[in-house]
UniProtKB/Swiss-Prot annotation:
This is Polymerase acidic protein. Signal peptide: none annotated. It comes from Influenza A virus (strain A/Chicken/Pennsylvania/1/1983 H5N2). GO terms for molecular function: endonuclease activity; metal ion binding; RNA binding. The gene is PA. Keywords: Cap snatching, Endonuclease, Eukaryotic host gene expression shutoff by virus, Eukaryotic host transcription shutoff by virus, Host cytoplasm, Host gene expression shutoff by virus, Host nucleus, Host-virus interaction, Hydrolase, Inhibition of host RNA polymerase II by virus, Manganese, Metal-binding, Nuclease, Phosphoprotein.
């Protein structure tokens, strides 16, 4: 790699990169990937500024090399590549002369035309994620961010790309060439995998002041200081009688340890009430896709272009009407919102050039659906001190709901195979350490089992929707932006396919804190008639919008097409986790690995191959009311993945509480099965803690019912 860098880059750039690395105590001969990355970044910064000048009138102009007009002023000041002291001197001098706010981190360039600092990024990873990391690190709206990737993608603050297309194309071509050159020498894979996220340095802190006093105050009785208590805990020998130890620790505790027998545990009490309703951010088994195969239209890859192309594949549109109203909403507004989407998509088509994004007109129906001007006015606490009767407003207890059969059907469907592949082989990420080829082999076997799984489709759909929504929330805060819900896959024959599930319209999104909410309206296609399970669709208004001709064994049948519309909301932190749903693949792969490891240690050899290729063997998947469920290893992989995906899709405080508390009971039951004669105290309190989490969440209720099945079979 070092030789390649010295051949590929201008000697001045190589020298600057070496200097920069030495300044941070790094060796270009050892950290060769970092050396290449620094050179690439420097070259992009220089290319960004090359040939760009400002003329006497203050306009930006491009002048190629060799032009005699030496009186022109450079448009960009290059900060990257200078030593730190010099760089900060330049930044300070710019801030003093222009009045621009001083940045927290050293930027790469200053743009005299736009009067702003510019941060240039070059990434080998997914461009959206890198952009968000940069934005989170800089935390300044004044510094303009512009990211390039080696795949020819780019992303910039508010989609303002600063330079003309030709200059940017030059940079993209150069990056592509570097990638090709590296690949031809077998260096690309290691370079691509070596990129780490943006790092911020955390300070180590001692416990002092108030925190120290709080720590001392919260010690158990009979302890004078934190050190004293730590020493006691470190030296605590847990043998002997537990009751005695407990009474030693505190006079108030008197615990009677009760033996835990097969007859001790009772089933969890599930709540009574109306059946629970669907609460995921997008439709799962009921979703319908409008798809195009081998997309090659102009602007392919731009979501709005793709969406319009997908919409054109369907010819059965009809005058929409409401078939299942939302109990509490103003249903005609949902109908008008869909009509508005259709009308505005039609308007786009009539324009000469289709725009890359579409902001909806702020009509009364959209303002209502997105809760515009509905938030209560915020008042500064200082202005309220004099009111004696200040109190938090009363909120009702959530209404209890009973388990409904649809959530088990949703889960079963998520474990099934589809006829498309949703991930490429390297989606789970390459091995970083050369830990033999076993890890790669396991990953490839696992990927083969889950790449066609419906849960994997949900992952890619979730990643896409959350990424698009978070980007729009940051880039178009005040706009009601129309966001197509899109996914991409490959057919059995390996043909690329782009799918449209429907649309989202985003509300105002001035998201300062992680938990600030952005409202959105989702409109999703479906063939499911909502009248079959109206309780599932309590939060939706459902329209009938067309008729679809389906091929079946008995010929062509016409089925009504529905649109599921609802108001929903999410936050920055939820979108961040949604963008990272691919982690579910990793989590379930690790669970499978631990099963293989256990098997391998018994047999004293690696069992990976036998594990995946012995199709006759069945494995325990779980326990249902019917008994212990068994299936192939592929089914185990897909079930574990579906569980992980549903934990992400249905994440909630109820799930957190249920998982943490039920685990304690699970461990006690496991100990009983292993003949370890467990003892418990306050088992009633544990049941109470578990059951207070069983309120109305469909996924938690299903897990609780599975838990009851497990108890029944475990204690036979």
């Amino acid at each position: 790699m070092e030789d390649f860098v010295r051949q590929c880059f201008n000697p001045m750039i190589v020298e600057l990169a070496e200097k920069a690395m030495k300044e941070y105590g790094e060796d270009p001969k050892i950290e060769t990937n970092k050396f290449a990355a620094i050179c690439t970044h420097l070259e992009v910064c220089f290319m960004y500024s090359d040939f760009h000048f400002i003329d006497e009138r203050g306009d930006s102009i491009i002048v190629e090399v060799g032009d005699p007009n030496a009186l022109l002023k450079h448009r960009f000041e290059i900060i990257e590549g200078r030593d730190r002291n010099m760089a900060w001197t330049v930044v300070n001098s710019i801030c003093n002369t222009t009045g621009v706010e001083k940045p927290k981190f050293l930027p790469d360039l200053y743009d005299y035309k736009e009067n702003r600092f510019v941060e240039i990024g070059v990434t080998r990873r997914e461009i959206h994620i890198y952009y968000l990391e940069k934005a989170n690190k800089i935390k300044s709206e004044k510094t303009h961010i512009h990211i390039f990737s080696f795949t020819g993608e780019e992303m910039a603050t508010k989609a303002d790309y600063t330079l003309d297309e030709e200059s940017r194309a030059r940079i993209k071509t150069r990056l592509f060439t570097i990638r090709q050159e590296m690949a031809s020498r077998g260096l690309w894979d290691s370079f691509r995998q070596s990129e780490r996220g943006e790092e911020t340095i955390e300070e180590r802190f001692e416990i002092t002041g108030t925190m120290r006093r709080l720590a001392d105050q919260s010690l158990p009785p009979n302890f004078s200081s934190l050190e004293n208590f730590r020493a006691y805990v470190d030296g605590f020998e847990p043998n002997g009688c537990i009751e005695g130890k407990l009474s030693q620790m505190s006079k108030e505790v008197n615990a009677r340890i009760e033996p835990f027998l097969k007859t001790t545990p009772r089933p969890l009490r599930l709540p009574e009430g109306p059946p629970c309703s669907q609460r995921s951010k997008f439709l799962l088994m009921d979703a319908l896709k409008l798809s195009i195969e081998d997309p090659s239209h102009e602007g392919e890859g731009i979501p709005l272009y793709d969406a319009i192309k997908c919409m054109k594949t369907f010819f059965g549109w009809k005058e929409p009407n409401i078939v299942k109203p939302h109990e509490k909403g103003i249903n005609p507004n949902y109908l008008l919102a869909w009509k508005q989407v259709l009308a505005e998509l039609q308007d786009i088509e009539n324009e000469e050039k289709i725009p890359k994004t579409k902001n909806m007109k702020k009509t009364s129906q959209l303002k209502w659906a997105l809760g515009e001007n509905m938030a209560p006015e915020k008042v500064d606490f200082e202005d309220c001190r004099d009111f004696s009767d200040l109190k938090q407003y009363n909120s009702d207890e959530p209404e209890q709901r009973s388990l409904a059969s649809w959530i088990q059907s949703e889960f079963n469907k998520a474990c099934e195979l589809t006829d498309s592949s949703w991930i490429e082989l390297d989606e789970i990420g390459e091995d970083v350490a050369p830990i033999e080829h076993i890890a790669s082999m396991r990953r490839n076997y696992f990927t083969a089992e889950v790449s066609h799984c419906r849960a994997t489709e949900y992952i890619m759909k979730g990643v896409y929707i959350n990424t698009a929504l978070l980007n729009a929330s940051c880039a178009a805060m005040d706009d009601f932006q129309l966001i197509p819900m899109i996914s991409k896959c490959r057919t059995k024959e390996g043909r690329r396919k782009t799918n449209l599930y429907g649309f989202i319209i985003k509300g105002r999104s001035h998201l300062r804190n992680d938990t600030d909410v952005v409202n959105f309206v989702s409109m999703e296609f479906s063939l499911t008639d909502p009248r079959l399970e109206p309780h599932k669709w309590e939060k939706y208004c459902v329209l009938e919008i067309g008729d679809m001709i389906l091929r079946t064994a008995i010929g062509h049948v016409s089925r009504p097409m529905f649109l599921y519309v609802r108001t929903n909301g999410t936050s920055k932190i939820k979108m961040k986790w949604g963008m990272e749903m691919r982690r579910c693949l990793l989590q379930s792969l690790q669970q499978i690995e631990s099963i293989i490891e256990a098997e391998s240690s018994v047999k004293e050899k690696d069992m990976t191959k036998e594990f995946f290729e012995n199709k006759s063997e069945t494995w325990t998947i779980g326990e249902s009311p019917k008994g212990v469920e068994e299936g192939s290893i592929g089914k185990v992989c897909r079930t574990l993945l579906a569980k992980s995906v549903f934990n992400s899709l249905y994440a909630s405080p109820q799930l957190e509480g249920f998982s943490a508390e039920s685990r304690k009971l699970l461990l006690i039951v496991q100990a009983l099965r292993d003949n370890l004669e467990p003892g418990t105290f306050d088992l009633g309190g544990l049941y109470e803690a578990i059951e207070e989490c069983l309120i109305n969440d469909p996924w938690v209720l299903l897990n609780a019912s599975w838990f009851n099945s497990f108890l029944t079979h475990a204690l036979k």
